[in-house]
Swiss-Prot record:
This is ATP synthase F(0) complex subunit a. InterPro entries: ATP_synth_F0_asu, ATP_synth_F0_asu_AS, ATP_synth_F0_asu_bact/mt, F0_ATP_A_sf. The chain crosses the membrane at residues 7-27, 64-84, 93-113, 132-152, 160-180, 197-219. Keywords: ATP synthesis, CF(0), Hydrogen ion transport, Ion transport, Membrane, Mitochondrion, Mitochondrion inner membrane, Transmembrane, Transmembrane helix, Transport. It is a multi-pass membrane protein. Pfam families: ATP-synt_A. One of its GO terms (cellular component) is proton-transporting ATP synthase complex. Belongs to the ATPase A chain family. It comes from Elephas maximus. It catalyses: H(+)(in) = H(+)(out).
Length: 222
């Protein structure tokens, strides 16, 4: 029992390597003047992501487009890998998500204080704050700034883990109810299918939300 619980927190390195290789396999570089449907879908998807993530940026902020697109595709594909049978999503590991959130957040903070020092400091004190509240507001805003990478990682971990656990519990209940009644099996099976579809949507939405928040942090500093 203890070994099973400890195995839950093991990082699946093999799955991560598969996730890293997936973009190169699924999103090949076009080498023909007239592309096929798969390349057309790829280009449409990338343009859609760029439009959603980079619409708020100026020309200087557009230099981050490749990083944001890569981040979105990596997290999305990693989340989807966790839905395969006998697999485990690396994004359910808080350490994996922190290893992405902390460097990206640190980069946005460093850029902000380097290129927009006054504006970055002004974010710590909202305009119109009463004088007697200034020390407390500065402390609150500083804490809010420092916990950004933690909230990024915890949000992604919690959403992916909750969905996987819900599917696992519902699937276990379906196996238990196999010998009870045919109608019960049918209802449970439909529930599992609906939860799986919902988890597919959550996997893609959480990848988008993670990249969108990084894009907003970059917008404040770039």
């Amino acid at each position: 029992m203890n070994e099973e619980l400890s195995a839950f927190f093991d990082v699946p390195v093999g799955t991560m390597m598969l996730a890293i290789a997936f973009p190169a396999i699924l999103l090949p570089t076009p080498n023909r003047l007239i592309t096929n449907r798969w390349i057309t879908i790829q280009q449409w998807l990338i343009q859609l992501i760029m439009k959603q993530l980079l619409s708020i940026h100026n020309m200087k902020g557009l230099s981050w487009s490749l990083m944001l697109i890569t981040l979105t595709l990596f997290i999305g594909l990693t989340n989807l890998l966790g839905l395969l049978p006998y697999s485990f999503a690396p994004t359910t590991q808080l350490t994996v998500n922190l290893s992405m959130a902390i460097p990206l957040w640190t980069g946005t903070v460093v850029l902000g204080f380097r290129y927009k020092t006054k504006i970055s400091l002004a974010h710590l004190l909202p305009q119109g704050t009463p004088t007697f509240l200034i020390p407390m507001i500065i402390i609150i805003e500083t804490i809010s700034l420092l916990i950004r990478p933690i909230t990024l990682a915890v949000r992604l971990t919690a959403n992916i883990t909750a969905g996987h656990l819900l599917i696992h519990l519902t699937g276990s209940a379906a196996l238990t109810l196999l010998s009870v009644h045919l109608m019960t099996i049918t209802v449970t099976f439909i529930t599992v299918v609906m939860l799986t579809i919902l988890e597919l949507a959550v996997a893609l939405i959480q990848a988008y939300v993670f990249a969108l928040l990084i894009s907003l942090y970059l917008h404040e500093s770039a």
